[in-house]
Curated annotation (Swiss-Prot):
Enzyme class: hydrolase
UniProt protein name: ATP-dependent Clp protease proteolytic subunit 2
Superkingdom in the source lineage: Bacteria
GO process annotations (BP): protein quality control for misfolded or incompletely synthesized proteins
Cited SUPFAM superfamilies: ClpP/crotonase
Species of provenance: Corynebacterium efficiens (strain DSM 44549 / YS-314 / AJ 12310 / JCM 11189 / NBRC 100395)
Family designation: Belongs to the peptidase S14 family.
Length: 199
């Protein structure tokens, strides 16, 4: 994705000023198309903040095709989504796993979509631990707190109980688009007959 977040008018005769993601950004469409890490999180947060400042009344569309990644980086994106005055419509396509699933279900209620062949996977967060025994104990407590916090938020977004989410995310839990809708991870499954997706 381009580091250039310039929102200038398209170049004459081209329809856009270069990078396809810049053109999509002008249409208020942003992509999470990779593993979630700090660099990607910073870019997505900046794009959400930019679009929110530009017009706080229009929706932002976030397309997700991600295997997941860093919990802290994902939480930065999630908190920015919630901080934005704009509705954030989320679209799961390809794979929305782990933190990808979390962000998909964290979209604005009623505006969370899955494409028909998307696969969604929910599981508990994972983390490597190391260091002294005291460090490991501290990290384990932080990990347990993060696990509880994420299960609580997923329960709020899906309408499932905290206990059910905790049980279901104990191991990898895979969903088709329709199963994700039934569970409450998304609100709609987009069919090809509905035509193009736009704001």
């Amino acid at each position: 994705m381009s580091d250039n977040l310039n929102m200038t008018a398209p170049g004459a005769g081209t329809g856009y000023s270069g990078d396809i993601f810049d053109r999509l950004l002008r249409e208020r469409i942003i992509f999470l198309g990779s593993q979630v890490d700090d660099e990607i999180a910073n870019k997505l947060c900046a794009q959400i903040l930019l679009l929110s400042a530009e017009d706080p009344t229009r929706d932002i569309s976030l397309y997700i095709n991600s295997p997941g990644g860093s919990v802290t980086a994902g939480m930065a994106i999630y908190d920015t989504m919630k901080y934005s005055p704009c509705d954030i419509a989320t679209y799961g396509m390809g794979l929305a796993a782990s933190m990808g699933q979390f962000l998909l279900s964290g979209g604005t209620p009623g505006k969370r979509y899955a494409l028909p062949h998307a696969r969604i996977m929910m599981h508990q967060p994972s983390a490597g631990v190391g260091g002294t025994a005291a460090d490991i104990a501290i990290q384990a407590e932080q990990f347990a707190q993060t696990k509880r916090e994420m299960a609580k938020l997923i329960a709020e977004h899906t309408g499932q109980t905290f206990e059910q989410v905790t049980k279901d995310s104990d191991r990898d839990r895979w969903f088709t688009a329709e199963q994700a809708k039934e569970y409450g991870l998304v609100d709609h499954v987009i069919t090809l007959a509905e035509g193009p997706i736009s704001n």
